[in-house]
Amino acid sequence: MLQNSNIRFLFVLMLAFSTSICFSQNNTVSPYSRYGYGEINDNVAGAYRAMGNVGIGMRGKGVINPMQPASYSAVDSLTFMFDLAASGMYTHYEDALGKRNRGGGNLEYLTMQFPIWKYIGLSLGFMPYTMTGYDITLTNSEYPYDTQTYTGTGGFSEIYLGLSYNFFNWAAIGANVYYLFGNVHHQRILSSTLTNYKSISFEDKINADDVRFRYGVQVFHTFDKHSFNIGGIFEAPTKLNGKYKQIDQTNADTLRAEGGFGLPLVYGIGASYTYDNRLTIAVDFLQLQWSQIEYRGEKGNLRDRNKISLGVEYRHNAWSKKYGERMPFRLGLSVQDAYIKQVKDKEFIVSVGMGFPLHNVATILNTSIEYGHRGSSKNLEEHFLRLTLNVAVAERWFFKRKL
């Protein structure tokens, strides 16, 4: 049965969910989002972003982990959870034409999780899948058009529903179903200070939607003060219901086409080790086979993305009366290939963060700061800082009324 306070809590939750949809714009200011679908989101929980974006081998009662659908069955049988995150990003990039800085931010995701049976957990939520956001101006580029402006906005979002079943108390399986939707808009404008030349605009618009699935499995065991968890995830390649339109305002020409878009085969493995509920070490390997899918009707425009993540968390005592001992401290590192062919160098991200417990042990404000580097000074080099804040709330939702 629901408590009265939980009815008010549900109202606030629905309001937050509506707000997240209304303001779910792209949270990237990277010039690299100009290529492909834009920046790719790996569905990492806020608590794990400070741990190098691990998640495949992570399983905990206090974290909603949409990256690994098998983890939902770890939820307590009387607990309702939700997680709301926001982030901000500052980018510094430079090329042969100079140095530039950009900044931006918005709501990141909203996820919920609760038990529907003793060994079954359910999760649902809303989050971005890709993000596009850049605004680049080049001067003295092509006579007589001395200014070129490149802009891009949009991205693809997804709503997911996931189930997980825990059997034998040492293994769990799970699956997510996603509905993906959205659009991406790119524009290039050539302008001139000469009065005899009008501005020229080239536009490129992509619209797509479809349903896809992710499957997960975890095997776990605890003895004495040691806990081990091994997990895996898999997604089959998906062909999107996509349309794109190219507009050349110079000749009033419009090219329209349908199909020719897809999402890659995805697989990943991960493992974590926890000692005495204090120290956790985790490692993930993730591969997305972008080279095998169609983009704009052609294969081979993209390349495979491999990612290795390593993370550490330390919390002295989650039940201590001393506030500092209840705080988790996190550190992480990830190395990955870009899925766009224009970037040959690997991307490196170093992350650090901590959690601030609120009115109970299960409700916590997590913070993470990520520093990343990609590209090279030969073409386009980017340094970025990303700050993520998320509130993970766990409420005692179901109870039996005493007669």
Where are these regions (language model features)?
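Bacterial N-terminal signal peptides
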Residues: F11-S20
